[in-house]
């Protein structure tokens, strides 16, 4: 199929013959790509936007297009709904806006007011969504496309608590090479003395050409760079602006107006149910001896730094459902939302729930689609949702890696009956305790779920791991590895008894795994299970790849560098016990770190 070249629309901006030819060439190249990935072709006006930003250099414009697409994909900037929370509040916060005046060259003026930014109250990807949304509104204008953008970073009245280094890096990276606008200059106004250190870090990332466009100014110096007619009153200008109400003008009359880039970005997101497991052997897998050498070479600090590389990557996807006002009370922690692309959806039932939301994510296992459901420790107001999920997903095994309370803080609710023969009713589902077995490191409870609507009963095995310390990670992985085997064996036995797997009637049901937030110990447990499964089958594994891929399905999985390093240690401990490496010398260096 040949790519179609988008026709020049009647209302398109006036271009020179050379610019029109460059636009046709750009569209021809880009639409070869859109045909390949079966997405809609790019329009003429969108093409012009990217070409304007690179002065109609076709190759540089193509590079910008892919940088922009990839940045939006990584930051989850897709299907924006500016009339819905939390994006609406972020837009209307006034921390970022576009002035209604231009500089003498015709450039649009964007203003970021640092004192209005509170990192501890904001979700970074929502801040970036608002930034993208408002910048997109600015570059919809042909005049802005042609004449560029001036960016003012107003630090007057701000303090260190208003500053976020990681956000600053992302904004500058965006402006310098991932957004279709000509960046004329960046004016940093009223910077405190402490700003010199973080700015020196940020400036190292910039090319000389971009660095030359950044100027740090006192408030009294701004009028030497822009006339007063272009500046707000607090910067010595004449523009009257109420930051609390100014951005209302940028909200569309209809929510969620079509964005041609949504389709182009979404094709690269992992679909919730259609692909095979993301955990398949990759090109950079290590043998166990290579892993020993790798950990000894990098040492503990190096592995911690490796985790930071993973942590810095923002989730691939969106959190609209988690952040919807009606669902916020169903999240145990406000900063642990659930990806829309992989979330478990409940069946809406009359009198039970008005939403299909639960903070739970499908997660792949080694060469197995949806092997786990990673979820938070149930809250009292989500007990019924939890058991509905267990029933609807035909779950046979539940793994709990926390206690009800740790360190004096509530970590999970008591969502199942603790004593033999006791029962709890959750709507039309009644859960009965058939028996409890207390082991050294875990407790095993056999539960029966009775669906009174369907008049069916099922057995579920509940495991609670008890040897994870209140703080940090276990000193040895031995008990967790043994526990992992017990869980695997129980799942295999339950599936075999169910008979569905051998008859091919349905895929193996997922194991529900939870801790408190559903990302730290849950991610550690699942990562270890995946890595050991691959090691046992192929003799190779890749921890970095496993955790990175896991976070595309259960965002923020593995919360700390300590948990990440524990995965490496646990694998080496397992390998030594199984005789995969000689005990002693090779592992002594690892253990002594």
Swiss-Prot record:
Kindly list the GO molecular function terms attached to this UniProt entry. non-membrane spanning protein tyrosine phosphatase activity; protein tyrosine phosphatase activity
Sites binding substrate sit at 470, 515-521, 559
Boundaries of every Tyrosine-protein phosphatase domain copy:
303-574
Q: What SUPFAM superfamilies does the entry give?
A: (Phosphotyrosine protein) phosphatases II, CRAL/TRIO domain, CRAL/TRIO N-terminal domain
Give EC number(s), comma-separated. Answer: 3.1.3.48
Give start and end of each CRAL-TRIO domain.
Answer: 84-243
Compartment(s): Cytoplasm
The chain residues annotated with the modification N-acetylmethionine are 1
Record flagged with keyword Cytoplasm:
yes
Q: Which UniProt keywords apply?
A: Acetylation, Cytoplasm, Hydrolase, Protein phosphatase
Cite the Pfam families for this sequence. Answer: CRAL_TRIO (PF00650), Y_phosphatase (PF00102)
Catalytic reaction(s) noted: O-phospho-L-tyrosyl-[protein] + H2O = L-tyrosyl-[protein] + phosphate
Q: Where is the active site?
A: 515
Extract the ranges annotated as region (Disordered): 1-21
The record's listing under InterPro entries reads: CRAL-TRIO_dom, CRAL-TRIO_dom_sf, CRAL/TRIO_N_dom, CRAL/TRIO_N_dom_sf, Prot-tyrosine_phosphatase-like, Protein-Tyr_Phosphatase, PTP_cat, Tyr_Pase_AS
Q: What is this protein called?
A: Tyrosine-protein phosphatase non-receptor type 9
> What is the species listed in this Swiss-Prot or TrEMBL entry?
Homo sapiens (Human)
């Amino acid at each position: 199929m040949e790519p179609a070249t988008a026709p020049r629309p009647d209302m398109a901006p006036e271009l020179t013959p050379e610019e029109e030819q460059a636009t046709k060439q750009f569209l021809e190249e880009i639409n070869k790509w859109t045909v390949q990935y079966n997405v809609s072709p790019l329009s003429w006006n969108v093409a012009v936007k990217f070409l304007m930003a690179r002065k109609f250099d076709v190759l540089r414009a193509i590079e910008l297009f892919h940088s922009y697409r990839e940045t939006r994909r990584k930051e989850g900037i897709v299907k924006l709904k500016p009339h819905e929370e939390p994006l609406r509040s972020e837009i209307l916060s006034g921390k970022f806006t576009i002035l209604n005046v231009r500089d003498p060259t015709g450039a649009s003026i964007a203003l970021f007011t640092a004192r209005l930014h509170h990192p501890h109250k904001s979700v970074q990807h929502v801040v970036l969504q608002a930034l993208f949304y408002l910048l997109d509104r600015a570059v919809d204008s042909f005049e802005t496309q042609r004449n560029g953008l001036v960016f003012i970073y107003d630090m007057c009245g701000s303090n260190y608590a208003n500053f976020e280094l990681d956000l600053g890096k992302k904004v500058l990276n965006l402006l310098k090479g991932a957004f279709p606008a000509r960046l004329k200059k960046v004016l940093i106004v009223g910077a405190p003395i402490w700003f010199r250190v973080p700015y020196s870090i940020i400036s190292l990332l910039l090319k000389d050409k971009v660095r030359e466009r950044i100027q740090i100014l006192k408030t009294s110096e701004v009028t030497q760079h822009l006339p007063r007619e272009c500046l707000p009153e607090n910067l010595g200008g004449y523009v009257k602006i109420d930051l609390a109400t100014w951005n209302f003008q940028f909200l569309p009359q209809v929510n969620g107006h079509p964005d041609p880039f949504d389709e182009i970005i979404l094709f690269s997101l992992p679909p919730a149910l259609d692909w095979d497991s993301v955990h398949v052997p990759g090109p950079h897998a290590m043998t166990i001896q290579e892993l020993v050498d790798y950990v000894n070479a990098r040492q503990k600090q190096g592995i911690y730094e490796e985790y930071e590389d993973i942590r810095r990557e923002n989730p691939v996807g969106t959190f609209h459902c988690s952040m919807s006002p009606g669902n916020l009370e169903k999240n145990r922690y406000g900063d642990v939302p659930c990806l829309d692309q992989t979330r478990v959806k409940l069946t809406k039932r009359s009198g039970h729930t008005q939403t299909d939301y639960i903070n739970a994510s499908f997660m792949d296992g080694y060469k197995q689609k949806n092997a786990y459901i990673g979820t938070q420790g149930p809250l009292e107001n989500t007990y019924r949702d939890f058991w509905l999920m267990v029933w609807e997903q035909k779950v046979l095994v539940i793994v709990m890696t926390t206690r009800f309370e740790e360190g004096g803080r509530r970590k999970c609710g008591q969502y199942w009956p603790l004593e033999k023969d006791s029962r709890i009713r959750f709507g039309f589902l009644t859960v009965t305790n058939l028996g409890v077995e207390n082991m050294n490191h875990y407790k095993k409870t056999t539960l029966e779920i009775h669906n009174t609507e369907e008049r069916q009963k099922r057995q579920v095995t509940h495991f609670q791991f008890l040897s994870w310390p209140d703080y940090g990670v276990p000193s040895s992985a031995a008990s967790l590895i043994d526990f992992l085997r017990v869980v695997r064996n129980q799942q295999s036995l339950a599936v075999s008894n169910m008979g569905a797997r051998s008859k091919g009637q349905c895929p193996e049901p997922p194991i529900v795994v939870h801790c408190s937030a559903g990302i730290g110990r849950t991610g550690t447990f699942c990562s270890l299970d995946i890595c050991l499964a691959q090691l046992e089958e192929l003799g190779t594994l890749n921890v970095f790849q496993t955790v990175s891929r896991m976070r595309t399905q259960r965002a923020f999985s593995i919360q700390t560098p300590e948990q990440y390093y524990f995965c490496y240690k646990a694998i080496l401990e397992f390998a030594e016990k199984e005789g995969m490496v000689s005990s002693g010398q090779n592992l002594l260096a690892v253990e002594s770190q």
